[in-house]
Amino acid sequence: MDISTDNPDHGFQFPGTFELSAMGTAERGLETELPRLLAATGVELLQESVSWKHSSSGKYVSVKIGFRAQSREQFEAAHQALRDHPEVKWTL
């Protein structure tokens, strides 16, 4: 089955710049661990695009990471690495 689109401007374009967010428990050091985890998948980490915010209670932290992926496979590997982390509760 061949899947094509009538508008190639829709959807992800590769290579491209993307951002993933992950939320987990604050005391686990996810602010530094998750960017290292993404870099290990082979994507180009955009250091200036790494940010985090603690929840109002301080129990959780949300980490946003910008990166460049050369292919959908690279993007999927980066997203899977975040999902597989035992302290990550959700990704976006």
From Swiss-Prot:
Which SUPFAM superfamilies does this chain map to?
Answer: YbeD/HP0495-like
**What Pfam family does this protein match (any one)?**
DUF493
HAMAP family according to UniProt: UPF0250 (MF_00659)
Matches recorded under NCBIfam families: PRK00907.1
Which family is this sequence assigned to? Answer: Belongs to the UPF0250 family.
Q: What is this protein called?
A: UPF0250 protein XAC0666
